[in-house]
Design a protein with these regions (language model features):
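Cytosolic, long alpha-helical scaffolding segments
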Residues: 1-169
């Protein structure tokens, strides 16, 4: 189950890399993202079903299986977020609206920070490196602070009445 969960993380990692690249350019190719998202959904279902069956058969409610189930479903949610970002930008484009230059740059910078943190987390998961896992946990607060600053910057653009900022809220 751990190996399959790592495979899920590999799919999500590539989806995130594609999203950062596409977000940066404003040009999306949905094919690779949708294909990986479908694979992520299938793998997640298989991992969760396997672990649930294992827990039923052994009547064992151990932390390791519970954590793997949570990790797998969170990874699936991350993949869903990439798809939502793509669909959001496509919807805006149909309305003739693009992210503001500053907003796009902030989204890309934030996505790159998240991506780097994901790499660290996925490596910690795959290797069982506790020190690396601690780095991931310790990096949570700085990332949350960065996201809070980006939200405030977005609100400032809303106050400036930028059409792109209002439409992308």
């Amino acid at each position: 189950a751990l190996r399959e969960t790592v495979r899920i993380s590999d799919q999500v990692q590539v989806m995130t890399e594609l999203a950062v690249r596409n977000l940066s350019s404003g040009k999306w190719d949905p094919g690779p993202i949708e294909g990986r998202e479908a694979k992520t959904d299938r793998l997640t279902r298989e991992v969760v079903d396997y672990l649930a069956e294992l827990r039923r058969r052994t009547h064992e409610q151990n932390d390791a299986t519970e954590h793997l189930m949570l990790v797998a479903t969170e990874l699936e949610n991350m993949g869903d977020q990439v798809r939502r970002l793509y669909r959001r930008e496509q919807r805006l484009k149909k309305e003739g609206i693009e992210f503001s230059e500053q907003g796009r740059a902030e989204l890309v910078a934030t996505a790159e920070l998240v991506q780097e943190r994901m790499r660290l987390a996925f490596t910690a998961l795959a290797t069982g490196d506790l020190q690396m896992a601690r780095q991931v946990i310790d990096g949570r607060k700085p990332l949350e602070e960065h996201v809070a600053r980006m939200r405030l910057a977005h609100l400032a653009r809303l106050e400036e009445r930028l059409l792109e900022s209002r439409a992308s809220s």
